[in-house]
Amino acid sequence: MEVRDKLKDNQGIIMATGSTEQHGPIGLIGTDTICSETIASSVAKKANMYLAPSIGFTPAEFNMKFQGTISISAQTFKSLLKEVTSSLLKHGFKYVLIVNGHGANIDPIKDVMIDFNNKLFFKSWWDFPTVNDIRNKEFGDLEGMHATPSE
């Protein structure tokens, strides 16, 4: 199906943001992106929306001492997010919904949202009540948010 055909049926597009950073000996370097992509993909399927390619290179300077981490500045991330969002809106999507997977992305995303007058929205994957219910049921007090089995 062509993008123009999908735009006839739906107005928005979903995009995941994550990070490329360490997650200890049990986690993958791309865990933040994998988690947000998984949830974004499920939402896109249920809502019959397109899923844009994910943004996995984001601010993670605090983890640069761990080999494998790739960090970009918050300003570079904001510029990238602005240009990607502008492109999607220019092509006819009415809004962009971000499913975020990295805490350091929150403030830059909020900063960029201001420029888009209610056409850019976000929710971090850990803010979905169903996700929290599953995490609490499966891991209880062992839930630690970062580099833990629930992630």
Predicted regions and their residues:
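Active-site histidine-anchored catalytic micro-motif
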Residues: 57-150
